[in-house]
Amino acid sequence: MELRDLSDHVEYRAGRGIEEVARELGRDPSEFVKLSSNENPHGPSPKATIAIREAATGVHRYPKAVHADLTGALADRWDVGDDQVWVANGGDGALDYLARATLDPGDSVLVPSPGFTYYGMSARFHHGNVAEYDVAEGADGFEMTADAVVDAYDGERVVYLTTPHNPTGARFTLDEIVAVADRTDEDTLVLVDEAYGEFTETPSAVTLFDGQPAGGHAPRDDIAVLRTFSKAYGLAGIRLGYAVVPDSWADAYARVQTPFAASVIACQAGVAALDDDDHVEATTDSVAWGRDYIHDELAARTYESHGNFVLANVGDAGRVAEAAKREGVLVRDCTSFGLPEHVRITIGTRSETERAVAVLNEVCDT
């Protein structure tokens, strides 16, 4: 038999791991620091680590009860109803659920360029078409504006807004998000990806739902918000994310989710991580320091960032990333994002960040 036509589909390529690079170069993994995948260098929440150990003996059971526990904890955190929280196997799983709930074959979505490849991948998996809007660099850096989105809008069923945006670090304000929703059709979903939301002081778009303190904005039923445990909570390896949706979608989750959408271990870890504010605060404080340090000390143009990373214009991203790799520092060459002059530097520990800046200054100067 033949597969369906996959010619329009692209491969998602994650940043390479330390072990893979070490094998390639014939060196010891301990020689490298990985600042290429926006992971939490401080590791998982200590409370989550304990919960993972305790959950291990229960993995022969399906996660129905603990799934409900996590859903309730998230609903309490955001002051929404349990039915408004769609727990998933990573943020990408939540994207798939939202695509299933909104897209008919032939519908189109509007995604940022550059941006997260999986937005378009998920739409195409669900027989949708993909259009793009530009995240352009202006005199003051990269900006996220409603005008840029709406100028490219042509009635798409879903519009994806990433805030803070990867890889630029720029953000949408709530006013700009509302402007996009106001200026698109009432049947268009504005999907706000807040995977890096813990690292910005901008209020979450969850505050735009009915019953929330939206700062003077009318409540919306055409916005959904994506969140993840991969970044600030340090749980990227267990794959846990969720969407927060309008209360009018109450019965849709059961119709679009996979059976037991997240594992016992993931759900237990998520519940524990939500109760570990000290870990999140230490992480975000470290990121704030690291962003300032890179902006101040890196001898290349950097851009204001509201994520756990900084984008830098180094002239030839491929050459610089390769040279840094040979010096033991892995950063993200952003050529694949359409930014061949830029690298993205994840904020590491203090020593990792200082080492990365020193190496990049050296290789950029050669």
UniProtKB/Swiss-Prot annotation:
Belongs to the class-II pyridoxal-phosphate-dependent aminotransferase family. Histidinol-phosphate aminotransferase subfamily. Keywords: Amino-acid biosynthesis, Aminotransferase, Histidine biosynthesis, Pyridoxal phosphate, Transferase. Signal peptide: none annotated. It catalyses: L-histidinol phosphate + 2-oxoglutarate = 3-(imidazol-4-yl)-2-oxopropyl phosphate + L-glutamate. InterPro entries: Aminotrans_II_pyridoxalP_BS, Aminotransferase_I/II_large, HisP_aminotrans, PyrdxlP-dep_Trfase, PyrdxlP-dep_Trfase_major, PyrdxlP-dep_Trfase_small. Its cofactor is pyridoxal 5'-phosphate. PANTHER family: HISTIDINOL-PHOSPHATE AMINOTRANSFERASE, HISTIDINOL-PHOSPHATE AMINOTRANSFERASE-RELATED. The modification N6-(pyridoxal phosphate)lysine is found at K231. It comes from Halobacterium salinarum (strain ATCC 700922 / JCM 11081 / NRC-1). GO terms for biological process: L-histidine biosynthetic process. Its EC number is 2.6.1.9. This is Histidinol-phosphate aminotransferase. PROSITE patterns: AA_TRANSFER_CLASS_2 (PS00599). One of its GO terms (molecular function) is histidinol-phosphate transaminase activity.
